[in-house]
Every structure is written in C-alpha cells, then in structure tokens.
Amino acid sequence: MRIEPLNGGPATERLVSRGRQQETWETSVVNAGGAGYYRVSYDDAAFARLAGRFDRLPAADQFGLLKDTLALGMAGRGPISAYLRLTAALPASADPIVWREQARTLAGLDGFYAPGAKRAAYRAWASDVLSPVLARVGFDARDGEPAADALLRETLLLALGQAGDPKVGAEARRRFAEAQTDLSRLAPGERRWVLIGA
C-alpha cells in the first residue's frame, strides 16, 4: 500500500497483510469501519477489486469508500465518475443511512451543472439510481418502520423532486391538489417535498 500525505510530504509504501500469505492477499478496505480521520486513495486495480464487491462490504465501509472517493474527486485527486459508479453500484437494500447521504450528495452535485443537456442527463441518471430505493421505502410511512427509513424517504423525495423525476412530480402535484380542499391530508413530514415537487 502506498501512503501519500496530502501535505506533499514523502510517500511511503507498506505491505498490509494481516498475517495472510502475499499470494492470497486480496485488496482490503483501508480504514475499515471508518475509525480513522483520513482519506484513502486506492490505485486503479485495488479500487476495481473493491468496487467489484462493493455490495458485500459492511455499511460503514461502503460509507467510507463513498466519502473517500467523493472527497478525492472534489479535490481533483481522482475522477468524480468513480464516486458516481460506486453510488450506482449501491444496492437499493443498503443501509438507509448510507443511502440518505448519497441522495443528499447527488442533489448537491446537481448544482454544479448549468441548465441544459448535461444537467438533464445527470438528473435522469440520478433519478434512475434513486428510484429503486424509493420503491423500497415507498411514498408513505408504514407502521413500525425504522426512523432511518422515514428520514431516507423525505431525503429521496426531495432529491428526486429536484431531479424532475416524473413519478415524484406527479405524486407531489396530486397531493398538492388534494391539500387545496383539505390541508389535513398533507402530513407535516411530506409538505416540503410536495411543495417543491408540485
């Protein structure tokens, strides 16, 4: 593993094997569990191996790898497309906390695009990535659902509304129209996304 300080200091190389034979060593997640406060940049081969089993990593490692890849891309030290590929590879069934952060990030990245064809393409892509997660949690709360699902739902609906997702837009307009005659039909937790999406 090559360790390269961000302050421009000398790089060092170390073999991290955890007692395994070098011939059978596979790429491990550096900073497993996110215990350290630093970013990790993998070479292309190591990143490809991690990305290939990304859906099987623990939630903390998925979160850490996503955050590392995003931070390096935003700093110009790696391609932002690597972050987008990882986000697209995140299963819809992944931890709601991990998905909530990715939905917020995708909504934030939208602001980097000027109105036009590239923004429209990005929004369509983001909608394709986030829609299966919304299909899992649904538009409405279920009895006994975890609080993380409720928070994820609101974040997804806001992000998808911003992206111009047609299903979210249609549902927002329907709920907005119903609320015109009976405001109690619009629950406090849905007002924001309905008003934005309508």
Which residues make up each language-model segment?
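Non-catalytic accessory/interaction domains
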Residues: M1-A198
